[in-house]
């Protein structure tokens, strides 16, 4: 996977966390930069670890399905991208109803894990491709740190407008990467 695909994947994977951070930022009266950075660090750390875990799980099965690697990555990315798009079109969830208060550490960790399950599944798919998983996981984590911090800071201003659109954009990016993987396999 080339650098462009890695960066697109990283920012595509960060869109769930970005959308969640916008929601979190929108529930706080005036989120401070330190609160936003704390959220970004938690989301980024979790989002760095989950593709590594998924990659490890995928490597255990790689020798059995190596000839199907491009199809596995394609189907996973299409599925995850489609799920993100569907979530983006759904109405506001209970998370938007939280009181305006500082979010606790464990609530942020739980939210980060929930938004990073896609990254774990992508990690499984990446096990079947020739990628530097450490660099890819770090790119995903850094993109998530940036996008989550940014999402918290702008959440109170645009939470109701762009929150779900960010998930739609992330889903489209994942689908695009899936199509690119399949295209590259067949057209070299």
Swiss-Prot record:
Stretches in topological domain Periplasmic: 24-65, 129-142, 188
Keyword list, A-Z: Cell inner membrane, Cell membrane, Ion transport, Manganese, Membrane, Transmembrane, Transmembrane helix, Transport
Query: So where does this one cross the membrane?
Result: 3-23, 66-86, 106-128, 143-163, 168-187
| Inducers of expression | Up-regulated by MntR in response to manganese.
Keyword Transmembrane attributed: yes
Offer an example of a GO molecular function term for this protein: manganese ion transmembrane transporter activity
- Keyword NADP in record: no
Q: Which family does it belong to?
A: Belongs to the MntP (TC 9.B.29) family.
Name listed for the protein in its UniProt record:
Probable manganese efflux pump MntP
Provide the species name: Escherichia coli (strain K12)
At the highest ranks, the source species' classification is: Bacteria, Pseudomonadati, Pseudomonadota, Gammaproteobacteria, Enterobacterales
What gene, per UniProt, encodes this protein?
mntP
């Amino acid at each position: 996977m080339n650098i462009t695909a890695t960066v697109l994947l990283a920012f595509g994977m960060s869109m769930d966390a970005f959308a969640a951070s916008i929601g979190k930022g929108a529930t706080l009266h005036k989120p401070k930069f330190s609160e936003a950075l704390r959220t970004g660090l938690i989301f980024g750390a979790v989002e760095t670890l989950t593709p590594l875990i998924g990659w490890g799980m995928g490597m255990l099965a790689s020798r059995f399905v190596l000839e199907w690697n491009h199809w596995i990555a394609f189907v996973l990315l299409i599925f995850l991208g489609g799920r993100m798009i569907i979530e983006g079109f759904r109405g506001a969830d209970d998370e938007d109803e939280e009181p305006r208060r500082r979010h606790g550490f464990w609530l942020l960790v739980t939210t980060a894990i929930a938004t990073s399950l896609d990254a774990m599944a992508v990690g499984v798919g990446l096990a079947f491709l020739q990628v530097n998983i450490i660099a890819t996981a770090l790119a995903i984590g850094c993109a998530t740190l940036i996008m989550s911090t940014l999402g918290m800071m702008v959440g109170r201003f645009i939470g109701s407008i762009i929150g779900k659109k960010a998930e739609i954009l992330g889903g489209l990016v994942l689908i695009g990467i899936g199509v690119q993987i399949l295209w590259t396999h067949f057209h070299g």
